[in-house]
């Protein structure tokens, strides 16, 4: 099954980078972002592909930096922010970098200019966002996976979406 996109639809991709990575890793596949962008540029009227990720700023080398730079130079709009470091109640060092608010704000802001949004995330926290965007007349498709354990695509998000591609390998894998 593929996502149904009409030729006249204005479309945008919203990629929750951490969630997509977490879905792909246990399934042992690498995401071909060039192919992914190419697929959607050929369908509908492609407006933008946004990729959301937090970056560890204080490290000499960040393992995600080469990907971020490649995406930035190859057609994606990068939305990043620095991670925050804190110590939990057990004295363990933790790093936090949630991009959900940034993604939600951008989606709400762009929704009036789009016909179809493709959300690459299985995060159930986005269910209400999807509902509100749909009320604005925008179709929302979700790409994630139910093949992982536990499934990365939350049930409530799958139920809310207009279309679900729960076997993300068909769209994003090499």
PLM segments and residue spans:
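Conserved interaction-surface patches within small, structured recognition/assembly domains
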Residues: 101-117
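Residue-level recognition of hydrophobic positions within alpha-helical transmembrane segments
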Residues: 96-98, 102, 121, 158
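Domain-level signal for Mg2+-assisted phosphodiester chemistry and nucleotide/NA-binding surfaces
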Residues: 1-99, 124, 139, 145-149
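Residues that line or immediately flank small-molecule/substrate-binding pockets and catalytic motifs
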Residues: 53, 121, 168
